[in-house]
Amino acid sequence: MSSLYYANALFSKYPAASSVFATGAFPEQTSCAFASNPQRPGYGAGSGASFAASMQGLYPGGGGMAGQSAAGVYAAGYGLEPSSFNMHCAPFEQNLSGVCPGDSAKAAGAKEQRDSDLAAESNFRIYPWMRSSGTDRKRGRQTYTRYQTLELEKEFHYNRYLTRRRRIEIAHALCLTERQIKIWFQNRRMKWKKENKTSGPGTTGQDRAEAEEDEEE
């Protein structure tokens, strides 16, 4: 009995849900079709017309939004012509040349200098006497290794003049040419003469004859 009493008191305190919805707290039924409901303000059939009218007020240039392209909308809003969007590189380069005239002048000067250099090179002629031949070129000083110098000194100690056959053998053994061996022995003989100070007609004539014989061999 007591439990039934408390239940009736509780239900009497909170009215039924049907009465709450009927009184107008939630007068409309929940549905996803907002656009088809004529009683909902802002989503009715006339909302599109009011939105278009408001947009026409913002952009007094004319027509609805659906009929205008993006370029037309921006042109009407910011006072730009549609032809201003068709920009090419040529006017941009012309503007740059107008802003920086010094660069174009430098480029033109460099081109003229290059053309003049090419013309001068084409007109310049090299004659045969201007070219240095292989025999006229200055040869660098030959450097001998320590082993080569030691072997040549040994050979010079035993014989100051070499025959052609012996010169070829030494050249092959020391990886040198015959001319290099010959020049080394000539220089070594001159140094030996200065060191010993050999003077006298007999000795000089004998050395000269031996040198000529060495060159002929």
From Swiss-Prot:
Record Pfam families: Homeodomain
Family annotation (SUPFAM superfamilies): Homeodomain-like
Record lineage: Eukaryota, Metazoa, Chordata, Craniata, Vertebrata
Any one of the GO CC terms: nucleus
InterPro entries, sorted: Antp_homeobox, HD, HD_metazoa, Homeobox_antennapedia, Homeobox_Antennapedia_CS, Homeobox_CS, Homeodomain-like_sf
Motif (Antp-type hexapeptide): 126-131
Family note: Belongs to the Antp homeobox family.
Superkingdom to which the source organism belongs: Eukaryota
GO terms classed as biological process: anterior/posterior pattern specification; regulation of transcription by RNA polymerase II
Protein name in UniProt: Homeobox protein Hox-B7
Keywords: Developmental protein, DNA-binding, Homeobox, Nucleus, Transcription, Transcription regulation
